[in-house]
From Swiss-Prot:
GO biological process: 7-methylguanosine mRNA capping; mRNA export from nucleus; negative regulation of viral genome replication; nuclear-transcribed mRNA catabolic process, nonsense-mediated decay; primary miRNA processing; regulatory ncRNA-mediated post-transcriptional gene silencing; RNA splicing; siRNA processing
Top-level taxon in the UniProt lineage: Eukaryota
GO CC annotations, alphabetized: nuclear cap binding complex; nucleus; postsynaptic cytosol; presynaptic cytosol
InterPro entries given in the database record: ARM-type_fold, CBP80, MIF4G-like_typ-1, MIF4G-like_typ-2, MIF4G-like_typ-3
Name of the protein described by the UniProt record: Nuclear cap-binding protein subunit 1
Species this protein is from: Drosophila mojavensis (Fruit fly)
Domain MIF4G: 31-243
One MF annotation (Gene Ontology) recorded for this entry: mRNA binding
Pfam families xrefs: MIF4G, MIF4G_like, MIF4G_like_2
Localization in the cell: Nucleus
């Protein structure tokens, strides 16, 4: 009997577990179905958005009892992750609130929590979308207009904070302004005086804020034909225009208007008092930007009109397109399809809007959000999907950019070159070059011939020399790059008179016979330590002739391809290290690479990158070489600055890596210590598994890591000091010489050079920012010429 009872109990237990698993599985299926329904609501289907919403409300209302928390989480996630469907979800919440007031209150609390958490964690876009959602709930009678205005007023209070960065104050004002298109009409009808008071406070702030950063972020220095407006100024002008139109905009879909009779009967909730978290030194705020304008209504005569620069519709359309790129940029085909499937495409000249927004992203200062090639690949997919219209709009945009290139920012010039050469390579290098031949009459340093020259250099990297020669009209002969072949001086006609010729020929034979690095060292010992003049050098000096013979001979033998060159450098790495003991010796190596490969810019870039990776040359040596007198003729060419930026990036990555490793080691050490103390305090039955000695770094290891990081920071600071000091020297010399000779200093060379200085500041702003006080004390002092000093002051203003 007892056995039977035990057997029955086991069966009951098994049935209970099986039923529990079934219930869990069924619940998971229902949750997944609910999530799918909520995510897809309002998307294209056979029924209307309103019908979709009514059906979904019925489903959710029935499941609120069981899946309340899940529904709250999904809806609040949608509010942040799918801002383009904001009004669809606010309508859904409004209808649920009308049927279940308690759920409406819970959702508002949940949304407020999301908003506060986003502010605390510096998730600025998520915070702005949360605020927009809360504001739109006023239109759905979920939240009272009075409590929303209190929140907006509290956010504008931040604009009066003292001793905080302007970028913090700017963001809170921007968040409020960008919310008003959704809720402005309702606030105007219900609380007009309070709304006007809010706008007055915003205007007072905007009138007194500094815009020192503005010129550094402009794509063009000229405002003709389109003004390059600072983002807050532009949005303020758009909001003022909206106010003049009595807050009536024509872009935002408002499905809740259909349900007004239901929603207006619902009880409203008041937002709690929300205080923005105080500023902390670790907080990073979005940097300011300049609104990019390329087209106006005269550029797109056919079809619907392009909204004016100060219409709120222009802001809303651009923001939506930027969000599509942000969401889908990882997959270029999906991104292009989503852009062309823009919901309001029949109301606007969509191709013009898309092209303008993509170039706005590409030319965004200080740096684009994504790699240049991301935007190029999306434009190619757009041309494939819309072959009848988009290539023509893109050609029109290219023409506009080329005609305005005289006043284009140097960083944007580089990006334009990179994009156009890549685009040409995907369309058989076809272009109507004859239309641009007027640039051939201009000085070689003028941006237009310079642009074509740099484009052809980039095309050479993506093709081959004969192809470039064939594709260009004969009139462009002077701009076509020289054939990319090595200039090995020990085989020239005058080679017999060169001091190192005998050893060079001996070295060629030995390397071809696959000699060892030791044998190369022995051969090089035959070269005495003399300069090129033949005079005996002191023992402490590097042997320039030895470096000359070795570097030029080895790299000439490896000139067949990048791989051959890399293999040669790797095999004789020890010889390079022995020869490159001092910075002067390293500069000599770079000089010989340039002498050998002066007609092959890409080879120079990849070889110097390789030498940096193998630590044969230091970053400071590369910087010093770039500013040396022998490189004067190359100074305005793009490849030289490509080398400088990859050098700085190499140093920056090294510092960041050491910083990360040190932080992780300190964290492990801290956790190990706390784990050890916790283990001592725990009871034997609840003892935690301690962190092993293998996982825990010793204090000595951490100290060594700190020393390494400190040394890296010193080297990084030295690199920036070298770069900026050289810029100041050559620019000051130019300005002084121009003043003495009574010439206009504003030459093409000067504009390129000041542009490159600005580019270094902006491209590496996160790392340079650490040393801004040092730079101000040592280099960018008040007695410096105002033209140079202004570049530094604009940079500092970006984070001020």
């Amino acid at each position: 009997m007892s056995r039977r009872r035990a057997h029955d109990t086991e069966d009951e237990s098994f049935d209970h577990r099986r039923n529990k698993r079934r219930r869990v599985s069924e619940n998971q299926e229902i949750e997944d179905r609910l999530e799918s329904l909520i995510l897809r609501v309002g998307e294209r289907s056979t029924s209307s958005v309103e019908s979709n919403l009514e059906g979904l409300v019925s489903v959710l209302e029935a499941d609120l009892g069981t899946f309340r928390l899940k529904i709250l989480r999904i809806l609040s996630d949608c509010a942040v992750r799918m801002p383009e469907k904001c009004t669809v979800y606010t309508t859904l919440v409004g209808l649920l609130n009308a049927k279940n007031y308690k759920f409406g209150g819970e959702f508002v609390d949940h949304m407020v929590k999301t908003f506060k958490e986003s502010l605390k964690l510096c998730r600025w876009d998520a915070a702005r979308y949360s605020l927009r959602f809360l504001a739109d709930l006023v239109n759905c009678h979920v939240i009272s207009a009075t409590s929303l205005l209190q929140l907006l007023d509290t956010m504008i209070d931040v604009s009066n904070e003292d001793t905080v960065p302007q970028v913090r104050r700017d963001w809170f004002v921007f968040a409020v302004l960008s919310t008003l298109p959704w809720v402005g009409r309702d606030l105007y009808e219900k609380k007009e005086s309070a709304l006007e008071s809010l706008l007055l406070r915003i205007e007072v702030y905007l009138n007194k804020r500094s815009k020192k950063h503005h010129n550094a972020l402009r794509v063009w220095s000229s405002d003709a034909p389109h003004p390059q407006e600072e983002y807050l100024d532009c949005l303020w002008a758009q909001i003022r225009k909206l106010r003049q139109d009595n807050w009536a905009e024509k872009h935002i879909p408002r499905p809740y208007l259909v349900f007004d009779s239901i929603l207006c009967e619902a009880l409203q909730h008041n937002l709690p008092q929300i205080t923005p978290p105080p500023h902390h030194a670790s907080f990073e705020y979005p940097m300011p930007w300049v609104v990019y304008r390329m087209f106006d209504y005269t550029d797109c005569p056919d079809g619907p009109n392009l909204p004016g620069a100060h219409s709120i519709e222009r802001f809303l359309i651009e923001e939506h397109l930027h969000h599509i790129i942000e969401t889908h940029h990882h997959e270029r085909k999906d991104c292009a399809a989503q852009l062309l499937n823009f919901p309001f495409k029949h109301k606007i000249p969509l191709e013009y809007c898309i092209v303008e927004v993509i170039f706005a992203e590409l030319f965004h200062m200080p740096t684009p959000r994504y790699l240049d090639i991301c935007y190029g690949s999306i434009l190619i997919e757009l041309c494939k999907l819309q072959p009848g219209t988009l290539p023509q709009v893109l050609a029109q945009a290219t023409e506009i950019l080329f005609m305005r290139i005289d006043s284009m920012n140097t960083s944007c010039f580089d990006r334009f070159v990179n994009w156009f050469s890549y685009h040409l390579s995907n369309f058989k290098f076809t272009w109507s070059w004859d239309e641009w031949d007027s640039c051939l009459l201009l000085d070689a340093e003028h941006p237009r011939p310079k642009f074509i020259q740099e484009v052809l250099q980039k095309c050479l990297r993506l093709s081959y020399h004969q192809r470039i020669t064939e594709m260009m009209p004969t009139t462009y002969a002077k701009l076509i790059p020289a054939p990319p072949v090595p200039n090995y001086k020990y085989t020239n006609e005058e080679a017999a008179n060169l001091p190192g010729i005998t050893v060079a020929l001996q070295l060629v034979g030995a390397i071809r016979q696959k000699c060892t690095p030791e044998e190369v060292v022995n051969i090089l010992k035959e070269i005495p330590n003399t300069g090129y003049s033949g005079e005996e050098m002191s023992d402490g000096s590097f042997n320039a002739l030895k470096i000359d013979v070795f570097v030029q001979t080895l790299l000439n033998l490896g000139s067949k391809s990048f791989s051959h060159s890399f293999a040669a450098i790797s095999k004789f790495h020890a010889v390079f290290r022995a020869l490159a003991e001092t910075e002067e010796a390293q500069i000599c190596i770079l000089h010989n690479i340039f002498e050998l490969w002066s007609s092959h810019q890409q080879m120079m870039v990849v070889l110097i990158d390789k030498l940096l990776k193998l630590q044969i040359v230091d970053c400071s040596a590369v910087a010093t070489w770039i500013f040396s007198k022998e490189m004067t003729g190359e100074f305005t060419k793009m490849y030289l600055w490509e080398i400088l930026h990859l050098t700085i990036k190499k140093m920056n990555k090294h510092v960041i890596k050491l910083n990360t490793e040190l932080s992780e080691a300190k964290e492990k050490l801290s956790k190990a210590d706390s784990s050890s103390s916790d283990t001592d305090e725990d009871t034997p039955h609840k003892r935690k598994k301690p962190i092993t000695h293998a996982d825990k770094p010793s204090e000595e290891v951490v100290e060594r890591m700190e020393e390494k990081l400190e040394a890296a920071n010193v080297n990084q600071k030295r690199l920036f000091l070298i770069v900026f000091q050289r810029f100041i020297m050559i620019l000051s010399e130019h300005l002084l010489r121009s003043d003495t000779d009574g010439r206009d200093p504003d030459t093409d060379w000067y504009r390129w050079t000041i542009g490159r200085l600005q580019q270094v500041f902006l491209m590496h702003h996160e790392q340079v920012q650490k040393y801004s006080s040092t730079l101000e004390t040592l280099l960018f002092t008040s007695d410096l010429d105002s033209h140079i000093l202004e570049v530094f002051q604009q940079f500092v203003a970006l984070r001020a």
